[in-house]
């Protein structure tokens, strides 16, 4: 499962955001919003700001996270608004996707696992995007020096260009790098990819 340090880090952050009423989309969620369509899987959804907004725009959303407090907040908002969001608390360290989605989102998630699990999850995401659908993936990469939210030896910083390379054969709709200042003299370095899975070839065609 995700380590206690990570769970505590995000639960504290979620509780602060709820108490302060801060539910704005972050820059990566803002970027993702216009690419969401159809059935959406939001892995590591946090407080569900993107899931809720996607549902308001007509998507049907499955929102998954390891934080019970975050899931409770999503259920409350979705129920009050009559929104098509199903929110479930799961152990993301062992979770397997069981159906295809038009859009699969994993913003700020994969780096919280050792390399083998991070790459396994990425392949699971790719394998469960419907043909013609999109994967939206955002990770921390090498060059990140703010590591307070990680358990030592229990995280993975992707290499520069690695995320893009792992979507070889897909159409890259967005590919970008962003650096953000973090507490102290440290930085968070991100890579974001929005990629469209190829359509299946028509029967009888190569």
What are these regions (language model features)?
Residues 1-37, 46-99, 113-120, 124, ...:
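Class I (Rossmann-like) S-adenosyl-L-methionine-dependent methyltransferase catalytic domain
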Residues 43:
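Conserved beta-strand/loop positions that form the S-adenosyl-L-methionine
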Residues 105:
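A conserved beta-strand element that flanks and buttresses the S-adenosyl-L-methionine
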Residues 108-112:
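Short catalytic micro-motifs in class I SAM-dependent methyltransferases
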């Amino acid at each position: 499962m995700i380590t206690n340090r990570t769970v505590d880090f995000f639960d504290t952050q979620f509780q602060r955001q709820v108490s302060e009423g801060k539910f704005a989309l972050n820059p990566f969620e803002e970027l993702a919003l216009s690419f969401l369509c159809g059935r959406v899987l939001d892995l590591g959804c946090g407080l569900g700001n993107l899931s809720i907004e996607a549902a308001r725009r007509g998507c049907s959303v499955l929102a998954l996270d390891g934080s019970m407090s975050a899931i409770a907040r999503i259920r409350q908002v979705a129920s009050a608004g009559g929104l098509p969001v199903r929110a479930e608390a799961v152990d993301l360290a062992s979770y397997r996707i069981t159906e295809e989605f038009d859009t699969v989102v994993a913003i700020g998630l994969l780096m919280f696992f050792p390399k083998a699990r991070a790459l396994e999850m990425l392949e699971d995401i790719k394998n469960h995007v419907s043909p013609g659908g999109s994967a939206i993936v955002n990770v921390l990469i090498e060059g990140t020096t703010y590591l307070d939210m990680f358990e030592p030896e229990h995280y993975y910083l992707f290499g520069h260009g690695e995320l893009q390379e792992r979507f070889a054969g897909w159409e890259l709709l967005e590919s970008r790098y962003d650096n953000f200042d973090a507490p102290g003299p440290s930085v968070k370095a991100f890579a974001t990819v929005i990629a469209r899975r190829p359509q299946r070839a028509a029967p009888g065609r190569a």
